[in-house]
Amino acid sequence: MFRTMMKSKIHRATVTHADLHYVGSVTVDQDLMDAADLLEGEQVCIVDIDNGARLETYVIAGERGSGVIGINGAAAHLVKPGDLVILIAYGVMNEQEVRDYEPRVVFVDAANTPVDLGADPAHAPEGSGLITPRMLSTLDAERESSLV
């Protein structure tokens, strides 16, 4: 059996520009591509945190060290400069690959510089203000105790 698994993600990247009159794709800083193990032409899902839009496209390498996250083509109708996005790549793996594989999870700052690299798809970096599913039982217990 083959399974489609999250291979890598760049979490909470800031869109630096959007160009409607472009052939298509998303331009990603080559440093971020390397950190997330993304190749030029690789399919990615883009999730816009600000408006909920989800779309699929492919990656084009941007200038190394530039922090570029550029939305190109028709996707520019859905995602705007300044929006926070998650770029997710999936891979189709057999049972053995699934057991041995660790995804690449890259958290970035407002300038799209990597600040946290890991392999846990549900990890939230310390001080990020994000809630991880692994925290829900603790949060539920805190809520219940505050109601008493």
Swiss-Prot record:
Residue numbers of Pyruvic acid (Ser) PTMs: S25
GO terms, biological process: alanine biosynthetic process; pantothenate biosynthetic process
Reactions that this protein is recorded to catalyse: L-aspartate + H(+) = beta-alanine + CO2
PTM note: Is synthesized initially as an inactive proenzyme, which is activated by self-cleavage at a specific serine bond to produce a beta-subunit with a hydroxyl group at its C-terminus and an alpha-subunit with a pyruvoyl group at its N-terminus.
GO molecular function: aspartate 1-decarboxylase activity
Cofactor note as given: Binds 1 pyruvoyl group covalently per subunit.
Keywords, in A-Z order: Autocatalytic cleavage, Cytoplasm, Decarboxylase, Lyase, Pantothenate biosynthesis, Pyruvate, Schiff base, Zymogen
Active site: S25 (schiff-base intermediate with substrate), Y58 (proton donor)
Source species, domain of life: Bacteria
Source organism: Rhodococcus opacus (strain B4)
Disulfide bond sites: none
Pfam families, per database record: Asp_decarbox
Name listed for the protein in its UniProt record: Aspartate 1-decarboxylase
Protein purpose: Catalyzes the pyruvoyl-dependent decarboxylation of aspartate to produce beta-alanine.
Pathway: Cofactor biosynthesis; (R)-pantothenate biosynthesis; beta-alanine from L-aspartate: step 1/1
GO cellular component labels: cytosol
Similarity field: Belongs to the PanD family.
Taxonomic lineage from the root: Bacteria, Bacillati, Actinomycetota, Actinomycetes, Mycobacteriales
Residues bound to substrate: T57, G73, A74, A75
Needed co-factor(s): pyruvate
EC assignment: 4.1.1.11
Compartmental location: Cytoplasm
